[in-house]
């Protein structure tokens, strides 16, 4: 050990000038290096634990002497530099921890203010909700008590708070949107009285009688809460149509039509082969007669008198060979035309007599009353004429089904009923024109906004009446189909009965 110390001491003194020349530093640095080397020489006993070097040649001995010296120099220099960098790193870490603590405290204050203003739960409440995650985080913080770990703990708490806050905001926003949507639909349903009714009508198929009955019931409920019930009843088509038993006859006709349709389907399902094909051809011919041809109202410019209409309807019913007669229908039509003639002559006579101003004012009052009366009687006449027409169709269907003898074929009856339907529709159109002419004549001095709605209502109800009659005519198709099938079966029986005497002979 003494030899080794003697060798290392002069070499260390030589290393100092080398560092001064190589690093171009002042002599103070060399002194600091020497001072730093002195403690290292005191710690040399650690090197004595090394193995004794083996005997080597002189050249190897010189290299072996140089290498330990270089190792000692390289050890001394990094150790002195690490001490400098270590102290600098500690100062950086301490300043960083202080900065992080300050920033974390500021962020915590901001979060607390935001929580109090927005009503967001505090971190303590959030930590209880995510207890498992917070437990793991606290365990890691206990293991690593460095300032950096504390900063990460603050950031993890902030991220957890932000996540939970985001979830609560999103869920609350979705709940708000759902509430707004439901409230909007409720407002729409309340604002639109026909909203629920429209949805109900789309889910079911209503017949004509059901629609008319619902309209009548709705109007009765509406008019029951008003003072002028009688006035509204005079001008409401549905109530008047039911008053003349039109709705009852229409429902009965629908029942007969449905029963006949079921029978026709069962008969067709029981047949096959040539009989089925022959019957289908005949039924198709019958359906063609129920397609009403478009008629032009301007073709008949000359107005028919009361006798002409009664004569035409009576002749058509005689061709059906049924016991019913259109007396009630003809009487309703004649009553309407007679009232129109009287209402047209009344204003003319009043205008001739009214010469003074007082008389003119009385004439205006009479004209106002006559306009309302004309409109009310027009609606009443249209409803009565339509109800009588549907009553005739109902009676005809019942007589065709229950009649024993069939003197005419089903196709001939369908052609007659088609002509009758066209005559009735033309009569309704002509009657509405006469009523509007009467309204125009009586309301010459009236404003357009008073007279036009009345005229429009008359034309509208006349169009509806024609549609009801055409629908009732279509309900007769299954009835006549049953009549055709029964007539064919009966003729087939007569043929078989005629062939039996020939076979006996």
Curated annotation (Swiss-Prot):
Record has Manganese as a keyword: no
Source superkingdom: Eukaryota
Keywords attached to this entry: Coiled coil, Phosphoprotein
Residue ranges the record marks as coiled coil: 268-295
Disulfide bonds: none
Residue list for modification Phosphoserine: 87, 146, 209
Molecular-function annotations in GO: purine nucleotide binding
Listed Pfam families: DUF719
Signal peptide start-end: none
Region (Disordered): 1-65, 342-366
Biased composition (Basic and acidic residues): 51-63
InterPro entries listed in its UniProt record: DUF719 (IPR007998)
Family from the record: Belongs to the FAM114 family.
Protein's UniProt name: Protein FAM114A2
Organism: Homo sapiens
